[in-house]
Amino acid sequence: HMDRVKRSTVIQFTMEEDLNLPEDKPDISTLNLEKGEVVIEEIRPGTDEVTVRGKLGYAILYHTQETGSNLVLLSGALPFEEKIHMEGTLPSDTVAVNGTVEDFTVNMINSRKLNLQALLLLTARIEEIYDEELPVGIQGGSAGEGVEYRISPMEVTELSICKNDIFRKKEEIPLPSSYPNIYQILWSNVSLRDVEFKPQEEKLAVQGDIQVFVLYEAEGEERSIRSYETTIPLNGTLECQGCREELLPDIRYSLVRQEHGQPELTIQPDLDGEERILGLECALELNIRLYEEEQIDILRDIYGVTKEVIPDTRDASLRQLLARITGKTKVTDHRKTDIGSPVLQVLHSEGIVTIDHQETTEEGIRLQGSIDLTVLCITENDETPYVSTREQIPYEYTLNVQGVTGTDQAEVHSELEQLQVNLLEGEELDVKAVLSFSTTVMKNIPLEAIEGVEEQEIDSNVLAGLPSAVIYIAAPGDDLWSIGRKYHMPVKTVRELNALESDELRPGQKVLLVKGLA
């Protein structure tokens, strides 16, 4: 089995909605943080099109001047249904669709009404699994004397396991004793770092880190705002029938988001009944592909010595693993904040790595994009102390892949491995990040597969035109096979006549050929 991308399409579309605050929400003073996430609910392939139904989940944090909490969370989802035109699509096709939010903007119309604008990107891919039947020898009349055939070994990469699965992780995260109890969660962010998959016998090992940030309103009369950030290990195994240690993994993963765009994070009581535990239910959607490298012998060419042998061929394509590459790059930048109030502290930062341009060069795969950065700060303004700023930090990096071409299949996965944002003098942010890129490059090997042969008598004029004996001077690219084909002689005969140990020739080497020897 082998796999390939049958076709892929990318579309952009916009969403806009005026949103009235629910009656139980206090008036808006100023907006603080906003986040949008695409949740795909249904994919329906049709004839030459794919219908995608989903939601734009949103979370909006704002300040209020009313009594009670200073910060208020507003979350929900907006439904959408889009048709993606894909020429050649059939209802029986299996289509994968990924959705991302390219831009999400929230504007305040008045204290009770918001305007939401979003630019969404949908990427649809049809991947197919196919088999290539290739000849390994000849039988019948052509297998006898007077016919030369060449069998060559080839390294191919076969698809051993292909499936989708979900890896689940439940974790209870207790607050340190110095932190007050939780009344309600105002904002949270869950992200993955350094995720790796290792094939084992009948299972997949998963390891990495989960970074958790939570901004919450504490219990008590003051209802103070506190934040807590921690990193917990992501590890475990997933049952995978047929899995073996020697298989090569190419696994794409994504964090399952709830309707509001975040994994499930709840408040749970501890043994004393106090609300001091964060309950995290984390689910990873996995697109699992495990490959196996194998050497196979293929009939590549055939010609006749005493008769004309005409092969019937068709175009075929094999896959070969070129490289499994991971590369990292550091990105640093200084950004002047445009917050308005003097900043006291950087409370939290989060970012998403986007690849805007991918190009194959002589050095490898050149990537250009940005880190979409959100920074939450505490300011001197007592009425609206929490303020956020968004920045785009550009990067450029080349994954060093020797021998890659534009026809090879290489899907690059990007990850924000480290992020540190510090406050400098003069309201300037110092950004330091480490980006990680990984890809599995599959080389497409086109070849002509021999499906059959037709035998004919050799034209007597062709045989008559061959010299009785000749000294042939090898040109670049010549070998005994090409010479034997040209002069209708067996390769073994030419080799023995010239006392050669191999079929390879160097340019300018002299080869004696005698007509009629077999």
Outline where the language-model segments fall.
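Membrane-lipid interaction segments
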Residues: 1-466
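Extracellular LysM carbohydrate-binding repeats and other cell-envelope/extracellular binding modules
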Residues: 489-518
